[in-house]
A protein has these predicted regions:
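Alpha-helical transmembrane segments of multi-pass membrane proteins predominantly involved
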Residues: 1-491
Length: 491
């Protein structure tokens, strides 16, 4: 029974996914209005599942019910519980943001079921303490996303899904190669067992361990969307349903970083190759920030622009991980800064995409130029999107400013001043394309004068995001404390 309780947050979402699909199939409603009649029921059940997952996570924290599940393959600790809250919250926001989108594009309960199942899989990824469990959760999440990206079944969505599938299969192969090397060297699949081997390994094993780290970085780099493994990002972000683009940009990225932290800070964090992967992460961080920001400068499609922006943001996350290993003993500030950044980024990016969903539905375009004069037509959406873009830039008093400040401070503390300077310079570059959108919305004349407002679902989701990013910017202590507790497991 204890195992069931500890696995409760994930189990709640898996059960909710099955219930949503099953109940929808059993509802005896036919005819033209069937989709409109079934949609509210499925949305209610999906949100109930998210609420149950939140409640289970809160119970685990209140009861201090931590430990292992499935013979040690899953570790329930402050780190995994942080991501349980994060993924449940993101899934709930995506459900809210998808209501109107599904109404316009013909509702299917499988969509909501896949959103919930993928969130549960990502929770499992963050909690996995064994290579086998990591791989199973990784592939469960990936399969759900392959389907979700192509859910619209039009040419653009299908092309995006095919590219994502082909490149995802390649990343899976690379990840498996890295895991196979670690298993072959250590004879262990548990991260603690591998860590014990690595801490005692001699120089004769360095090359093989470095090769394993390179393969894992390449495979998981696809999930994190860092250079040079970012080829899929712009096309998939542009072609996928906009709520799924938001989901990919936040949840999939966070899950990738959670797995990287588990593997590299637990299994490979105390041994002879720590400096090797720290240098690798630092180089990838610098290149990702620069390439992502430079390519975003001339983008005309706002989803594509945010795709390149997400590559740059992933590079900023990696600064924190490079800082962890660049200092001995390990710098806890580096890990906690990454965890904090992921939480702050979720509020910021989700809010931006909620506004984009509402605006693009009205103007029938995702081109930045067509956002001209949106402030006069919908002040609420324009102000909300502006707040999110300002946060992505890293301007106070927003969550993005605090997050970048913590990451850059971690780099300086780890004697990676050059990397912090590159990060600051790239933040300045990013201000051009983020604030360009703000100027278009506030200073240009609109194409038509009719005003509009988002639906209650979208408006509520965006309001949560904007209030959250401003609250974190003004009073970051609660999220800082949560991130610190999550990071302590790697100490």
């Amino acid at each position: 029974m204890t195992d069931v309780l500890r696995f409760g947050p994930e189990l709640a979402l898996f059960i909710a996914a099955a219930v949503v699909i099953t109940v929808d199939a059993l509802i005896p409603i036919a005819g033209k209005s069937a989709y409109d009649a079934r949609r509210p029921i499925a949305v209610f059940l999906a949100l109930a599942g998210v609420g149950a997952s939140f409640a289970m996570s809160a119970i685990l924290i209140a009861a201090d019910e931590k430990g292992t599940v499935a013979s040690g393959m899953i570790e329930v600790d402050d780190f995994s519980l942080f991501f349980s809250f994060l993924f449940a919250g993101v899934a709930g926001m995506i459900v809210l943001g998808s209501v109107d989108y599904l109404a316009r594009n013909r509702f299917h309960a499988e969509y909501l079921g896949l959103v919930l199942a993928s969130a549960a899989a990502m929770m499992t990824m963050a909690a996995a303490a064994d290579l086998i469990m990591i791989f199973v959760a990784l592939e469960t999440q990936a399969i759900a996303f392959y389907v979700l990206v192509g859910f619209l079944k039009d040419g653009r969505s299908s092309e995006a899904a095919l590219k994502y599938l082909l490149l995802g299969a390649t990343s899976t192969a690379l990840t498996l190669y890295g895991m196979a090397y670690l298993f072959g060297l250590s004879g262990q699949t548990s991260l603690d067992g591998i860590a014990q081997y690595v801490s005692n390994a001699g120089d004769e094993n360095r090359s093989a361990l470095v090769l394993a780290a390179v393969f894992l970085t390449a495979g998981l780099g696809f999930k994190m969307a860092v250079v040079p493994f970012q080829m899929w990002v712009p096309d998939v972000y542009e072609g996928a349903p906009t709520p799924i683009t938001a989901y990919l940009s936040v949840a999939s990225k966070a899950a990738g970083f959670a797995v990287v932290m588990r593997i590299f800070l637990v299994a490979l964090g105390h041994g002879l190759i720590t400096s090797d992967w720290a240098n690798l992460f630092a180089a990838i961080a610098a290149i990702s920030m620069t390439v992502g920001n430079v390519l975003a400068l001339n983008q005309k499609n706002i989803k594509r622009m945010l795709g390149y922006s997400s590559i740059a943001q992933a590079g900023t996350f990696l600064i924190g991980l490079a800082a962890v290993a660049a200092k001995d003993p390990q710098l806890e500030l580096g890990t906690s800064s990454v965890v904090f950044f992921l939480g702050a980024y979720a509020f910021t990016n989700l809010g931006a995409f909620m506004a984009i969903i509402a605006i693009s539905a009205k103007i029938k375009s995702e081109q930045i130029e067509d956002f001209a004069g949106i402030y006069r037509r919908s002040p609420f959406l324009a102000l909300g999107l502006a707040a999110c873009l300002i946060s992505l830039t890293g301007i106070p008093p927003t969550a993005g400013f605090v997050a970048k400040l913590l990451v850059f401070n971690a780099a300086v503390e780890a004697n990676l001043v050059w990397l912090a300077l590159i990060g600051v310079l790239n933040s300045v570059i990013s201000a051009y394309y983020y604030l360009r959108v703000v100027l278009v919305m506030f200073t240009r004349d609109p194409s038509e004068a009719t005003t509009f407002q988002p639906s209650p679902y979208l408006g509520f989701a965006m309001m949560i995001s904007v209030v959250g990013l401003l609250a974190i910017g003004v009073y970051p202590n609660p999220l800082v404390d949560a991130a610190d507790h999550a990071a302590r497991i790697f100490g």
